Amino acid sequence: MITRLFAQLVSLSIVTYWNDAIVATNFSWLFITFFVMTFTFRTFSRYFKKPIIWTLYFFLCLIAFLLLWAARIHINILFSFAFGDVYSFFMAGVFLFYGFGELLPIGSDSDVGEASWVVNPATGASGSGGNGWTESAANDPAREVSLAPFPPQLTHPVPFPAEPGSPDPVSPPPPIASFYSRIERAESLHAGNIELAEDLQRIQEMERNLENERSPYRGRELAARIDWEVRELEGKVARNRAWDMVRDAQLDIWRQGLDQELVRQQENESRLEERRFQSHSTNSLFEADSSRDN
């Protein structure tokens, strides 16, 4: 805020010494059209993920800026003849207190971090426009979720292998033996699926709030929050997929062990049956020899 006010005062002192109305008007249109291009690019560029689309959109905004700058002479001539110096200083004032101030940063990171927004999980009520978001109190740190700076999880790679062809960096997977104690029962698996469904529903609700958000600053904060929630959900899905793989591997081991145990039992039964047959044959021969002796 201090830098913005300082820039406005400096610009006002410069415009004060402008005596030519056309020069002042031209410079005002230059900065106003540049502000329109910058504001449009800054508002809609977050929807483009690929660099080539981002670059093409930048040049599109630049062409629109040049067209506005080329058309300013006709507007200047019309309004300068009608209003004279009043129009000139009016355009300069618009540039001073709106255009050039908006081109500067909004302040330090601490200024951005002061605005914290949390969703009410119980009611979903809102104190600002009914969009499901409420401004949290400073004395309630348990429910306060600051959207800037980002949580430290954003700087860490996904701790499990990603899908084939994924550009996300991943860390080496943990040893498979560490997951043997994490094999859940059917109830815990169902609870995990419910948790993933709730997270997905919360992300969809935040996306609807983002579509209805009119403030560009809160929109950017909400978009950053959505990105973080999506990364968290992807991490949970990756962990569940890894646990499923480990569970399947353990079931295969148990199935192989069961098959081997069944084979051993069949071999033992075969040996026992063979011994019984040999014993029965020996007893029959002994009884036959005894009957001959008698």
From Swiss-Prot:
The principal localisation class reads: mitochondrion
Basic and acidic residues bias spans: 265-277
Topology relative to the lipid bilayer, per the entry, is: Multi-pass membrane protein
Q: Does the keyword Transmembrane apply?
A: yes
Q: Where are the transmembrane segments?
A: 21-41, 51-71, 77-97
The species this protein belongs to is Arabidopsis thaliana (Mouse-ear cress)
List UniProt keywords, sorted A-Z: Coiled coil, Membrane, Mitochondrion, Transmembrane, Transmembrane helix
Name the UniProt record assigns to this protein: Uncharacterized mitochondrial protein AtMg01200
Instruction: Give the CC-aspect GO terms.
Output: mitochondrial membrane
Further remark: A stretch of 270 kb of the mitochondrial genome is duplicated within the centromere of chromosome 2 resulting in the duplication of the gene. The expression of this duplicated gene (At2g07698) is not demonstrated.
